[in-house]
């Protein structure tokens, strides 16, 4: 009985460490190419994902801390930024590697520049209609 309890506790001690912590500095490895997008009639920066980055990040559960950016408060659409809104990608002060889309499991209420930690699955994107990285199934870490 005691052995079974020890094995069970040992197993559950690993359940909370499945995700890796992702740093904003690691995202600086991403190279971008500027291409003209006919759909938006504008120049956009498209990420060039190396096989190594895809293997290490795509589809992996990650945890990251940053500043919430409210894109649409009614539809609960948010981004996460390495920097506060006044100096983030949307204001032209930072690169596209410093921001990611958040797709929450459930609607959440956030305010711009609220510092949050989120956990979710990384989706590496090349579509000019989305940010380079989306955190899918995101949950707020308490």
Report each predicted region and the residues it spans:
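Positively charged n-region of N-terminal signal peptides that target proteins for export
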Residues: 1-4
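Short hydrophobic transmembrane-like helices used for membrane targeting/insertion
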Residues: 6-7, 17
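N-terminal signal peptide c-region/cleavage motif recognized by signal peptidases
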Residues: 13-15
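OB-fold and OB-like single-stranded nucleic-acid-recognition modules
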Residues: 18-142
